[in-house]
Amino acid sequence: MLDSVTDLASLLKDPTLLATKSYVAGEWIAADDGSTFPVTNPARGDVICQLPNLGRAETARAIKAAHAAHREWAARTAKERAQVLRKWFDLCMANQDDLATILTAEMGKPLAEAKGEIAYGSSYIEFYGEEAKRTYGDIIPG
């Protein structure tokens, strides 16, 4: 262990990518009771950030918000959904280095492997964004 706490945000081009709250219903929230838990770098053992220790009430609110968001998402046109997914893909790829740095610190894996994982995972977003344009009805023709 080199030190007990790593200032991971200082290693990022865009430190806002290191979220230390939970995203629920369009807002970044802390635990109702303010409790947190440490996220440690398994390769070094140092703490890279503290995250909210959400309880039952916060989890129930998150599930309710996700259910409502799904209805809103389903109401979008195929083209709108494709545009959102494309934007998400573009953002992932534009921030690949920072996301890989976070992944490396969180998982302890080599940076090159983390960069590949970001690209690979993002390729699924790109694929489904393209598929979102294709509305066939209930069954995709075979």
Model-derived segments and spans:
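Glycine-rich loop-to-alpha-helix module at the N-terminal edge of alpha/beta enzyme cores
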Residues: D46-Y136
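Terminal low-complexity tails and localization/encapsulation signals of metabolic enzymes
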Residues: M1-Q50, Q83, K87, T135-G142
